[in-house]
Amino acid sequence: MATKRYYSAVAQDTTLSSSITSGGTSMVVGATVGFPSSFPYALAVDYNAASEELVLVTSAAGTTLNITRGYNGTSATGHNTGAAIRHVIIAQDLTDFSAHMDLTTNVHGITNTAALLTTSTDISAAGIPVAFLTMGA
């Protein structure tokens, strides 16, 4: 069974308030505006840089986040103060979604999942905010 992770369509980018070593299990960020209030959720540290690392946030107290390092196949590495941080969807989420689609083919009379949710009208009718698909664009 897939691990449930939480998301926010309104999470604002932030930065690392102090450096962390590759062995650190917590980090302090500048702000957590819009971050999910439930756990776990994924963040990219040093977003879009060669040293980018995915971490899984397991709990938080204010702007101090407790994290699992080197998440989803990335390597735990040190990060400097000011490193860009972004709330992200990870590859495993897409794999889990695809597996769910495969398992639910032919459920409720749906036989052609390739044609599902192909337009913004279809997506809105399904109750999925179109803005969700344009996050980070």
State where each predicted segment sits.
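Fibrous stalk/shaft segments of extracellular and virion attachment machinery
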Residues: T68-S75, H79, R86-A137
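Short, low-complexity, polar/charged sequence segments that are solvent-exposed and flexible
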Residues: D46-N48, A84-V88
